């Protein structure tokens, strides 16, 4: 049966929907119409395609990681090199699409939330390209962890709002951005950074990120003359993973593994393993798996990686998990740091801490699958933004050899 989600109410099975105040419903409906129109607009599609090619640098390589494969001692590991995009991560695929859409809708301002700062940088980049005013909401904790990205955003002309509410991380930045959108919905588009939020955001972000899997599928077929046995990608909100998974959804032989952040361990309160430890609830306008206590209060998510410490997961991921189309696993901070070092030393590629979770799991999975099998890992971003943090962490552990 061909996969066809979401339904026309924006649900993926029981997940998804539009749980927003009346004040935002008009904006959400307007966005739905504009997005559907843009899909049928050849001028819009041609402009986006040209930007992805000439500005972002697509298509990026599908790279056979020979030494990583030898290190793991099992399945062949291919890396989809989203780290080579302009701005250094997959985030630009979506930011460009949405800012172009905002321009088409006649908006002259964009706002966005950011965790690691990559989506903020990508949105500020796209706003600069189109000459639009840009405001980024970022939790105070993340502002401290990612000061370099804060400077990048300001350099690109964006205003960065440090959010001091709650636990001062990504979920609080989303809250602040949604509040700001309500207040200025007439001339402003909210550039959602992941497959989250009320419909049509999860679908829009998925569709703009699906270029990852579309390219990877064609590239893999060309190299191996068959489909891969497995796909591996890290999952915070879940946009790089959904971008890789979605074009393979009807290929039943291809297994999909979403790698969540186990932080200090899933048996501690300090993790972001939403599928493993969460249950369905409404957050930020959508019904999805959420980390919550017995009273339904949202718990704080924790990860060494600022891009993964979100207490929810995109509704389509919740659906994939519920129907068994994808498996969701977890990797601790320690294992991710090991992945960070392994890829750097075997391939000369320094990955983002987010992507390091996927690398760490891929090494485990490759051993399990054996040398006859193949996999694609989404290298969602480069590690420049994390080098100082990792340096401090490893020096504290006196582990730099």
Curated annotation (Swiss-Prot):
InterPro entries documented for this protein: Trp_synth_b_CS, Trp_synth_beta, Trp_synth_beta/beta-like, TrpB-like_PALP, TrpB-like_PALP_sf
Keyword field contains Lyase: yes
EC annotation from Swiss-Prot or TrEMBL: 4.2.1.20
CDD domains (UniProt xref): Trp-synth_B
Pathway assignment: Amino-acid biosynthesis; L-tryptophan biosynthesis; L-tryptophan from chorismate: step 5/5
Catalytic activity, as annotated: (1S,2R)-1-C-(indol-3-yl)glycerol 3-phosphate + L-serine = D-glyceraldehyde 3-phosphate + L-tryptophan + H2O
Enzyme class: lyase
Name of the protein in its database record: Tryptophan synthase beta chain
């Amino acid at each position: 049966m061909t996969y066809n989600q979401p339904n026309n109410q924006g649900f993926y099975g029981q997940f998804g929907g539009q749980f927003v105040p009346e004040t935002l419903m008009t904006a959400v409906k307007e966005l739905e119409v504009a997005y559907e129109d843009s899909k049928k607009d050849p001028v819009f599609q041609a402009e986006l395609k040209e930007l992805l090619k000439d500005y972002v640098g697509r298509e990026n390589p599908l790279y056979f990681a020979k030494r990583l494969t030898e290190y793991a001692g099992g399945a062949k590991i291919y890396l989809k090199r989203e780290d080579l995009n302009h701005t250094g991560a997959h985030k630009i695929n979506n930011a460009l699409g949405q800012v172009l859409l905002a321009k088409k809708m006649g908006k002259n301002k964009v706002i966005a939330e950011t965790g690691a700062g990559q989506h903020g940088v990508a949105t500020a980049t796209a706003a600069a390209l189109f000459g639009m005013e840009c405001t980024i909401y970022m939790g105070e904790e993340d502002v401290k962890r990612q000061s370099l990205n804060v400077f990048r955003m300001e350099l690109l002309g964006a205003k960065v709002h440090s959010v001091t509410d709650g636990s001062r991380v990504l979920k609080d930045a989303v809250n602040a951005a949604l509040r700001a959108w309500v207040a200025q919905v007439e001339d402003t588009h909210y550039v959602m950074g992941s497959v989250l939020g009320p419909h049509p955001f999860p679908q829009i972000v998925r569709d703009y990120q699906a270029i990852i899997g579309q390219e990877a599928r064609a590239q893999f077929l060309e190299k191996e003359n068959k489909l891969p046995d497995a796909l591996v990608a890290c999952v915070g909100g879940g946009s790089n993973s959904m971008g890789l998974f979605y074009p393979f959804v009807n290929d039943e032989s291809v297994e999909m593994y979403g790698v969540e952040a186990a932080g200090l361990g899933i048996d501690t309160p300090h993790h972001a393993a939403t599928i493993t430890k969460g249950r369905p609830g409404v957050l930020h306008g959508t019904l999805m798996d959420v980390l919550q206590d017995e009273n339904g209060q949202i718990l704080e998510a924790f990860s060494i990686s600022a891009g993964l410490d979100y207490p929810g997961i995109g509704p389509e991921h919740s659906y994939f998990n519920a129907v068994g189309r994808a498996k969701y696993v977890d990797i601790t901070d320690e294992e991710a740091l090991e992945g960070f070092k392994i890829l750097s030393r075997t391939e000369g590629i320094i990955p983002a801490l987010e992507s390091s979770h996927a690398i760490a799991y891929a090494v485990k999975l490759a051993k399990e699958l054996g040398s006859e099998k193949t996999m694609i890992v989404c290298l969602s971003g480069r590690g420049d933004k994390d080098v100082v943090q990792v340096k401090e962490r490893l020096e504290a552990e006196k582990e730099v050899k």
